[in-house]
């Protein structure tokens, strides 16, 4: 990957609540949950189903777009005669018929190849299929482990921005902010704003997206969507659409949705938005297991948030960011609950008490 067009994080707008807190105001900040801003090299898992064929071996170096496996669209279970396998056969081995007179499916068909699954009564069960599809790796890295029927584990090259959930298939593309620069944290993806000019890109949406927009984005050739929150209804609709797409005869390119925070609608965190803005125009990958945005941009300088910068991750003020102003002790909140709280300055307003359990900081 190249670093052309990548802006350093230092050029991004200041974060909300960026004035530096005094040393005395930072007391108790260690009680706030710390969220790592970036992760080191990840180990990404690409699952394999029975019958899938791995095309790489442990130790292989790969680049983005490499076909690492073949997936069987319609795998079937075939029982082999005892004479069809050698005495040293093991579960996970690839099996191929000796010739045109080889084993055939019970419903008819040609000679079979597949993966040996298990042995029962002196006969081996074979997972076989007729329509293999390539599984492409969206990132560069080194193959660490290959386990038939389980998965391929790859150590990714570069850094990663973790999410909480990713739906769809691993993919990669050019990162696009997807909306006006000043509105990227709270932007909304509307289906009417999508066109074929966005083909091959991964869009940063902000806080709001609906299932119709996701379906249209995929049809327009968009490779992925980055959103802060995805509600339950949109999630169910997208998964149903994915199921129909997997069953289609001609599948579209891989498409993924990565959720950065959860189901509640809220803006993208300021420190995270600063990184995404710095990556605009660069090639990034979305992985499913673990859910993350992976990029290999050594020239991207990631600025640390100011001391005392905190974000409200849940509760009435979810999504707001400000400056830690010290411990507030036990306070009474909605519902008559008493919780340990801290003072937080939000939008240059007087400090308010927020439950410590509702806060997070970045490191």
What is each PLM-predicted segment?
Residues 1-363:
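Well-ordered secondary-structure scaffolds
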């Amino acid at each position: 990957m190249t670093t052309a067009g990548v802006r350093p994080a230092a050029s991004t707008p200041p974060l909300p609540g960026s004035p530096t807190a005094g040393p005395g105001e930072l007391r108790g900040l260690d009680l706030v949950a710390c969220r790592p801003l970036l992760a080191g090299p990840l180990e990404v898992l690409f699952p394999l189903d029975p019958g899938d064929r791995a095309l790489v071996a442990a130790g292989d170096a790969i680049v983005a777009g490499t076909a690492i496996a073949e997936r069987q669209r319609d795998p079937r279970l075939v029982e082999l005669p005892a004479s069809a396998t050698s005495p040293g056969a093991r579960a996970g081995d690839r099996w191929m018929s000796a010739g045109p007179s080889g084993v055939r499916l019970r419903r008819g068909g040609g000679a079979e190849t597949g993966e040996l699954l298990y042995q029962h009564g002196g006969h081996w069960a074979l997972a076989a299929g007729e329509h293999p599809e390539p599984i492409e790796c969206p990132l560069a890295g080194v193959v660490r482990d290959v386990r038939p029927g389980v998965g391929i584990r790859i150590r990714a090259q570069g850094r990663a921005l973790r999410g909480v959930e990713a739906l769809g298939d691993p993919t990669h593309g050019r990162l696009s902010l997807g909306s006006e620069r000043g509105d990227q944290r709270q932007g909304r993806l509307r289906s009417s704003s999508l066109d074929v000019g966005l083909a091959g890109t991964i869009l940063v949406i902000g806080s709001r997206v609906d299932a119709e927009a996701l379906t249209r984005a995929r049809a327009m050739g968009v490779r992925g969507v980055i959103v802060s929150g995805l509600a339950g209804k949109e999630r169910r609709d997208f998964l149903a659409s994915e199921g129909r797409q997997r069953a289609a005869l001609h599948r579209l390119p891989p498409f993924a949705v990565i959720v950065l925070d959860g189901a509640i609608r809220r803006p993208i965190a300021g420190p995270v938005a600063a990184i995404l803005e710095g990556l605009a125009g660069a090639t990034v990958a979305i992985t499913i297991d673990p859910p993350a945005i992976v990029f290999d941009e050594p020239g991207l300088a990631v600025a640390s948030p100011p001391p005392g910068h905190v974000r409200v991750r849940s509760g009435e003020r979810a999504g707001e960011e400000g400056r830690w102003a010290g411990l507030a002790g036990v306070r009474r909140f909605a519902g008559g609950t008493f919780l340990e709280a801290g003072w937080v300055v939000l939008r240059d307003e007087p400090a308010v008490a927020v439950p410590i359990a509702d806060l997070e900081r970045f490191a």
